[in-house]
Amino acid sequence: MAREVKLTKAGYERLMKQLEQERERLQEATKILQELMESSDDYDDSGLEAAKQEKARIEARIDSLEDVLSRAVILEEGTGEVIGLGSVVELEDPATGERLSVQVVSPAEASVLENPMKISDASPMGKALLGHRVGDVLSLDTPKGKKEFRVVAIHGR
């Protein structure tokens, strides 16, 4: 049996949008490939080969997204009392007062490019956050070594 993939509602919607975009890209790539095949006298043409590879990459991405979405279980809204999958957490460095906001998500949703950063529950930081409450102080491994953070706020999923 395939393992379920836990997603926030927003994460599920984002992946559905990506799937739509990839399907549109596939249609365009197929059209370009057909045009190249019709106009090419030499089937060893590097442009034709590149188009085939791009189409294959898009198909693989579609397969991957469809697989994740077919196994998706959308998380219910949390209470905000305990950090769990989908929680948005505000952390503060007690030494500097610097604040950091992250959301704990499944590996399928993880992205450091978003705000708040989406941290995988399977990552060291994600594992360290799970189960904590407001006021807890925890030690996290960062690229600059161990750092302490205090949980300032937890917002539900």
From Swiss-Prot:
PROSITE patterns: GREAB_2. GO terms for biological process: DNA-templated transcription elongation; regulation of DNA-templated transcription elongation. One of its GO terms (molecular function) is RNA polymerase binding. Residues 1-74 form a coiled coil. InterPro entries: GreA/GreB_C_sf (IPR036953), TF_GreA/GreB_CS (IPR018151), Tscrpt_elong_fac_GreA/B_C (IPR001437), Tscrpt_elong_fac_GreA/B_fam (IPR023459), Tscrpt_elong_fac_GreA/B_N (IPR022691), Tscrpt_elong_fac_GreA/B_N_sf (IPR036805). Signal peptide: none annotated. Pfam families: GreA_GreB, GreA_GreB_N. Keywords: Coiled coil, Transcription, Transcription regulation. SUPFAM superfamilies: FKBP-like, GreA transcript cleavage protein, N-terminal domain. It comes from the Bacteria. Interacts with RNAP. Inhibitory activity is regulated via a pH-induced conformational change of the structure. At pH above 7, Gfh1 is in an inactive flipped orientation that prevents binding to RNAP. At lower pH, Gfh1 switches to an active orientation, which enables binding to RNAP and inhibitory activity. Belongs to the GreA/GreB family. Inhibits all catalytic activities of RNA polymerase (RNAP) by partially occluding its substrate-binding site and preventing NTP binding. This is Transcription inhibitor protein Gfh1. The gene is gfh1.
